[in-house]
Amino acid sequence: MPLQSPLTFSDEQINIGELKQELEKFSSTQKQEFLNHHPVTSLVLARAEYMDLLLTRLWQYFGFNDIYNISLVAVGGYGRGELHPLSDIDILVLSNNKLPTALEAKISEFITLLWDLKLEVGHAVRTVNECAQIGRDDLTVATNLQEARLLCGSEDTFQALKKVVLSDSFWPSETFYRAKIQEQRERHARYHDTTYNLEPDIKSTPGGLRDIHTLSWVARRHFGATSLLEMSRYGFLTDAEYRELVECQDFLWRVRFALHIELRRYDNRLTFAHQAQVAENLGYVGEGNRGVEMMMKEFYRTLRRVAELNKMLLKLFDQAIINGGATENAEILDADFQRRGSLIEARKPALFQARPETILDMFLHIANDSTIEGVSPPTLRQLRTARRRLNKFLHTIPAAREKFLALCRHPNALHKAFSLMHRLGVMAAYLPQWSQIVGQMQFDLFHAYTVDEHSIRLLKHINTFNNPDNHAKHPICCDIYPRMQKKELLIIAAIFHDIGKGRGGDHSVIGEGEAYDFCIEHGLSKPEAKLVGWLVRHHLLMSVTAQRRDIYDPDVITEFAKQVRDEESLEYLVCLTVADICATNPELWNAWKRTLLAELFYSTQRALRRGLENPVDVRERIRHNQQMASALLRKEGFSARQIEVLWQRFKADYFLRHTHTQIAWHCAHLLRMDDPNKPLVLISKKATRGGTEVFVYTKDQPALFATVVAELDRRNFNVHDAQIMTSKDGHVIDTFMVLDQHGEAIDESRHAAVIKHLTHVLEAGRPTKIKTRRTPNKLQHFNVKTKVDFLPTKGKKHTLMEFVALDTPGLLAKVGRTFADLNINLHGAKITTIGERAEDLFILTSEAGGRLSEEQQNELRDKLIEKLSDAVTA
């Protein structure tokens, strides 16, 4: 049935019930048309037109047409004639003089009806003079009035308003421009000045619709241009820039429309909760999260294009219009470039098209000259044109390859040149592989940035290793990097480390081959190319080994050292690893990770220097730890006999897996105990290995691990490592490395309460109830399949279990309870949280003390998957 025009609604139809039905019918029709691929521009304009007709009819119904000198005016986005399904409908009831009380009451009825219809109406009732006064003081009001459009009522009253708004005294063009630039700067700062936010706001994020609006507002104020097309006619945009902005706006409108038809309340944020459905509405499909990632890739690329155009056009406007073309004197840099103020500019109008390799010369100048802060607007426009007209990638030009390698070797390029090259599209113009990762996101909570943005941040983090002020944060890297002979090898590895993502298959393997080929093409030796390729292939090796393997097992160190081969590779790898972690998510790096990587680095360094054919003597390490710990204990007044009697109860593994200071600390408290049958809980006052050590000594009891981690979870602490041991006389000697919610050591003010509550549950001697908490909303939109794998343990008496699951509340306690239910002994745990994923390693033995049989492994796998699947769906 065709839609009825609101203008034809009878008085009888004007009631909340029937009007709601008509609005729902219109919205439903628009939704279906959108899903059937009707042009979004026509839908956005049609919605505004429908509201025009509805408001006009209601204006008539309330009898306002019979009242002289009042007008109904659309302002803001509605004034532009643009409405999305949940857009605000901003209206102004305009009059020449203050309205009588009775008329104000009737207008209030009119507005109330609109609200009752669930329309997002923003309104003001003002005289022309009030609009002028408020508009002069309020930039937002002034901007809205600039887009005012008469819906119905007095034309004369509306024209009186337009006369005020268009006058130079209302908001002079330059004043308006400066205010809008500051407003945009503040808005961008709220989004951390990046287009790459995980849950971006379609409207307000840098590169979003507001950046297009800002261009329109500035041009409208100066030229009177009312559309993007008129902006191009005034010469504010070239034809190509006009077409690009229209294309970008169309895409952003489609994303916004697709979002709004899924929401009940106004929102422009592409949250995780809605990204999948929006992608489906837009026709992006693929296995798993592929559809979302494809949509977000195009979305981020669009934001980059808008942000680049916005910045360039506003600078051009400032230079050519506001400053009347006045410029500073230029300082000639060479035959091709000059510096004007803090900006570099090309000296010839078609330089980049005639000799594309000079694009890289420009960035070498930027790296060389600390006073250059950016590229002049005309040169930026020339660069954009040349970039689009390139018929081959820049790396195919021999002269360009020399210059790119020179940038990789330049000490200042990491700080200045590469990020600007990326932002201006030069990295993508140079490397075809880079162009494929631009805007490539990963639908998870771990990667805070797109692949390209992450890679640029990685380069910047490498540069921080040159600064002595960062030595406390990155001691190993700050020692290694400044003396590294061929830093360019690390830089190239950083550029390529994630370049294979988004293409299917193992991105490390893809990147290895491409990095090797790149090095050979750029004139590096085969050994250098092999090292770079190896770094790309194994860029996750050190992080995984440190966080998810038992690095106190000499066999683990030997195996890692075999893969690394030599100290040079180890030094390159640790720098790449640390920078990679820091550039993945600002919240990832902490003292715990720093300590783990340092322990792995130094253990491997010792193994390489000793020679892999000379493995560590375990018995010698135990003797060393005992001698050092004994000396500390004797200083505290304990006799050799007391120490010997206590240590006779301990197994050798205890002395192997703890430092001598830990052993002395534990044993001093154990020797002072009045009743050795009571539980002992200790908490380290100083951070140990970057975290807080919680030591537990008590008689063995069922599900002890689950009891301890459940109690720590109750206090919102996270266990990252656990050493689970039993003495020869049936006591447990457990050590837990714990961090708070912010990845820091536990504040000392909380120690007493933790000791008290842990002691209480241990004295109770029964498994504590696991605290049930609702899965956080942000986790509910991720599907992490529970996965249990058993790793080969040749020659070992234990079984290694790798475990992946959604990081739900109480997860670790549930896993520990499952071990207890199946009479499986836990000897150690490495706990790693990667965004929404828990990726843990457990060291297990059977009740009899040996490796788990295949039957036991299968039973454990089935039980864990069953229990955790129930927990997620509960």
Swiss-Prot record:
Pfam families: ACT (PF01842), GlnD_UR_UTase (PF08335), HD (PF01966), NTP_transf_2 (PF01909). PROSITE patterns: ACT, HD. CDD domains: ACT_ACR-UUR-like_2 (cd04899), ACT_UUR-like_1 (cd04900), HDc (cd00077), NT_GlnE_GlnD_like (cd05401). Residues 333-692 are annotated as: Uridylyl-removing. The keyword RNA-binding does not apply. One of its GO terms (molecular function) is [protein-PII] uridylyltransferase activity. Uridylyltransferase (UTase) activity is inhibited by glutamine, while glutamine activates uridylyl-removing (UR) activity. Has four distinct domains: an N-terminal nucleotidyltransferase (NT) domain responsible for UTase activity, a central HD domain that encodes UR activity, and two C-terminal ACT domains that seem to have a role in glutamine sensing. Belongs to the GlnD family. Modifies, by uridylylation and deuridylylation, the PII regulatory proteins (GlnB and homologs), in response to the nitrogen status of the cell that GlnD senses through the glutamine level. Under low glutamine levels, catalyzes the conversion of the PII proteins and UTP to PII-UMP and PPi, while under higher glutamine levels, GlnD hydrolyzes PII-UMP to PII and UMP (deuridylylation). Thus, controls uridylylation state and activity of the PII proteins, and plays an important role in the regulation of nitrogen assimilation and metabolism. This is Bifunctional uridylyltransferase/uridylyl-removing enzyme. It comes from Vibrio parahaemolyticus serotype O3:K6 (strain RIMD 2210633).
